[in-house]
A protein has these predicted regions:
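Acidic, surface-exposed loops and disordered segments
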Residues: 1-167
Length: 167
């Protein structure tokens, strides 16, 4: 799975959005209390305004939907752990979009104060809800080949040792 560099026009089905949302909502919660909240943007005007707040590559301007992943600090039973749930939900969105034939691109909102403030105002979020990430969705014009970032040098067993496992 990787970011898709070109998105073609075409509406994203409600069923695909619901499947993506279902996967994102079913993550294990580190913060407990399921503090993740989601704002689906599917109107051109809202997408355009959001792209002025969160830097996105030009190709994402063709996306016909985006999901803003937010954390509700009041629902997080463990303070400041809401962001971990948002990160896991964002990853689920990327993976489920890919499984549904969609391309996706993720942009960080949190911890950038200007982006948080701008998105909070645009979406009229209550004070306890913090926007975390912005995921653009669209059908890929072409799918690049799979990328393999595996490196044995990044794997350590039983401590910071650079050697293969004895398994």
């Amino acid at each position: 799975m990787q970011n898709i560099p070109d998105i073609k026009q075409g509406p994203i089905s409600v069923d695909a959005i619901y499947e993506i949302m279902g996967a994102a909502m079913n993550i294990p919660s580190v913060a407990k209390g399921q503090p993740t909240q989601f704002v689906v943007l599917n109107q051109i005007e809202a997408l355009s305004k959001a792209s002025e707040i969160v830097p996105v590559p030009p190709f994402t301007m063709q996306a016909l939907a985006a999901i803003v992943v937010c954390g509700d600090k009041d629902k997080a039973q463990e303070k400041d752990k809401w962001m971990f749930d948002c990160e896991a939900a964002s990853q689920q969105i990327l993976m489920t979009a890919h499984a549904n034939g969609l391309g996706s691109y993720i942009s960080a909102i949190y911890p950038h104060h200007d982006r948080i403030e701008g998105m909070t105002e645009l979406l009229d979020l209550p004070g306890n809800v913090v926007p975390h990430s912005y995921v653009s969705l669209g059908y890929p014009a072409h799918v690049p080949g799979a990328r393999d970032a595996f490196s044995n040098e990044r794997v350590h067993y039983n401590g910071w040792v650079r050697r293969k496992s004895t398994f």
